[in-house]
Amino acid sequence: GVSFSILSGLQGLSIFGPAGTREWFESLQAAYPNLERMESRVQELKAMDSFSIKGFDIFAEEALHSVTALAYRLEAEERVIVYSGDTEPSARVAALADGSDLLIHECSFPEPFDVTNHTTPLKLGNMLSNHDLKRVVLTHLYPQAEGHEDEMAQQVIELSGAPTIVGWDM
């Protein structure tokens, strides 16, 4: 996550997220007094909402998770990035990603894990098989995925046809 020492020096912060984001941020402000002094604006979104900010057109779509979750499509200068957030395989997220330059999609567990609220490589590859994607980055890997990263990316490639790599948190 973003260091709170960095956040405390910001003059203003715009936060966009699904229902519950305002309450979540207020709890952070209560726990970290420096955040209370920062001017902030929280805008809660729902599926099918769209807005523009600083040259980006942003579209929200429902993701499938244990709590309210959204995926986002960012468009600017003829480039498109889609970020899934936490989600099970979702036709809505796949449609949102269609034609994108980059899909950043969670892929928490390797095969043969049977999971809910998250995605495995075969389910992701199947979901994307009829969509046009230039590149996929797998994120949000759980410890069970350690040592299986290359295999997971290859499974998505074989089913979706999209070049796929595993992203790493810093």
Question: Can you annotate each of these PLM segments?
Answer:
Residues 1-83, 88, 95, 150-170:
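Binuclear metal-dependent hydrolase catalytic cores
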Residues 89-170:
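Cap/insert and terminal regions of metallo-dependent hydrolase folds
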